[in-house]
Amino acid sequence: MMKTTHAIRWKAKDFALQGIDGRTYSLADIRGPKGTLVVFICNHRPYVKASINRIVTEANALREIGIGTIAIMPNDTESYPEDSFDNMKAFAARYGFSFPYVIDTSQEVARAYGAQCTPDFFGFNAKDELQYRGRLDAARMTAVPNAGRDLFEAMKQIAETGHGPQEQFPSMGCSIKWKD
């Protein structure tokens, strides 16, 4: 289990990553008119499995308010074949992803963003400035009543004002599986 912390308000880094649909995606391809959510996830780790339905639900709700979303899989697929490209396709189909799911084979994008765990959330305003570096909600491994909607509320605020909340709780998940 890892918690993330990160400086706020740096600019989103561009990328060119292959999606499970065969397309190559850049930041411009997924940017929403009100902001962008970049999520680092994988297919097999328990924190992602426990929260993926909520992540998909929130991404769908965010699209309605002008926030574009992309999910990036940064793990070493040679050491962790559960995160292979083919398994990414099956995972996205199983959970009904409505947003691009791409692979960061070189892990350069994950390093550039400072991603540390899966899931890990980076919320940017319309000017591509990082405004949210926090958790999905307070539920952790199991969905619980009254867990709140930290990510959704933060991104809604960003869509409305261009600025994220002052109080942010770090994301928690399994560490990214880096290549040696």
Regions found by a protein language model. Give the residues of each.
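Chalcogenol-based redox active-site neighborhoods
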Residues: M1-E167, S175
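A short, charged, Gly/Pro-tolerant segment at domain boundaries
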Residues: P170-D180
